Regions:
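Catalytic active-site module of serine/aspartate enzymes centered on a nucleophile-bearing elbow/loop
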Residues: 246-289
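Acidic catalytic loop of the alpha/beta-hydrolase fold
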Residues: 226-231
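Gly/Ala-rich beta-loop-alpha elbow adjacent to hydrolase catalytic centers
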Residues: 109, 113, 117
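Flexible "cap/lid" loop of the alpha/beta hydrolase fold
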Residues: 118-123, 128-159
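Conserved HGGG/HGGXW glycine-rich cap/lid loop of the alpha/beta-hydrolase fold
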Residues: 15-75
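Short beta-strand/loop motif that positions the catalytic acidic residue
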Residues: 216, 222-224
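Conserved alpha/beta-hydrolase catalytic His-Asp/Glu region
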Residues: 142-143, 158-214
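Active-site loop/oxyanion-hole signature of alpha/beta-hydrolase fold enzymes
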Residues: 16, 56, 61-108, 268
Length: 289
């Protein structure tokens, strides 16, 4: 059996350097761009791409950030330390959308992808039909100490990262899905997870700014798993309370990786959100036509 997922590469310039970025897609309709978690890749969204209830109405896309999955790092990577920044992340998303000609996509991001969704709502709400942040908050207090131990020669970085992430998966996750989620972390490149956490832990702090998000310009949905102790439900609730019009949902029996740890449970929360977006955005576009 062939799955309906197609994988391709797109060449884009990021930070004035050429990059060859891998992405997968499936479905037809309004574009739904999915952003993976720190240290992982677009495979986390494979279940969305094989769900006919979604792909019958949405063109689902997910790219691997440079250094992640099947996207190679840029030339000269061996001579520099990787640190993801807010500006670089926003540039990456906008450049990908422009390269593929995505007209006002809905963006769904998880963890670091969820946090950057808040930045997109601040910087460029007019570019998107709606924004969905999974496991997202303006700031999360680190539940780990210094990250230098994630990248050192006497430690297997991939196995350490997967072990670190294992506790963030809800106990209700099917064993197969749990281990698939952890496998992606075990495969991560050297220093990549640590570099992503620079954005997640320090540089991407949005406290004092999220109250400027205007949800009348772009609807915002925040969904967080009840078992997530990296971005806790209280973190998300506190962020949502500062954004008038933000829709906050705490997802039962889910952790930090809802789309990959328990796809069937996650779709119960995602499908109504997508349906609401089609209804509200469609009505708005009809009025503006």
């Amino acid at each position: 059996m062939l799955e309906p997922i197609t994988g391709r590469y797109v060449h884009i310039a990021l930070g004035e350097r050429p990059h060859r970025v891998y992405f997968e897609e499936a479905g037809e309709g309004w574009p739904l761009l999915c952003l993976h978690t720190a240290g992982a890749d677009g495979r986390q969204f494979r279940h969305l791409m094989t769900d006919a209830a979604i792909t019958s109405r949405w063109r689902v896309l997910a790219f691997d950030m440079p250094r992640h999955g099947k996207s190679l790092p840029p030339a000269g990577w061996q001579d520099e330390e990787y640190r993801l920044t807010t500006d670089a992340y926003v540039e990456m998303i906008v450049a990908f959308c422009q390269a593929l000609g995505l007209a006002r996509p809905v963006v769904l991001g998880c963890s670091i992808g969820g946090k950057i969704v808040l930045e997109l709502a601040l910087r460029a709400p007019e570019r998107f039909r709606a924004l969905i942040g999974l496991e997202a908050a303006a700031h999360q207090e680190p539940w780990y100490d210094d990250t230098s131990w994630l990248h050192r020669p006497d430690v297997h970085g991939g196995e350490l990262c997967s072990a670190l992430m294992s506790g963030l998966i809800a106990p209700h996750a099917p064993a197969e899905s749990r281990w698939e989620t952890l496998w992606m972390y075990a495969q991560g490149g050297p220093g990549v997870f640590r570099g992503d956490l620079h954005f997640y832990r320090a540089e991407g702090d949005l406290r004092g700014r999220v109250d400027r998000i205007d949800t009348t310009r772009c609807p915002l949905y925040l969904l967080t798993g009840e078992y997530d102790f990296s971005c806790t439900p209280d973190d998300t609730r506190a962020t949502g309370a500062r954004i008038p019009g933000a829709r906050v949902t705490i997802m039962k029996e889910l952790g930090h990786f809802p789309m990959s740890e328990h796809p069937q449970r996650f779709r119960e929360y995602l499908l109504p959100v997508l349906e609401e977006i089609r209804g509200t955005a469609g009505a708005s576009e009809a009025r503006d036509a």
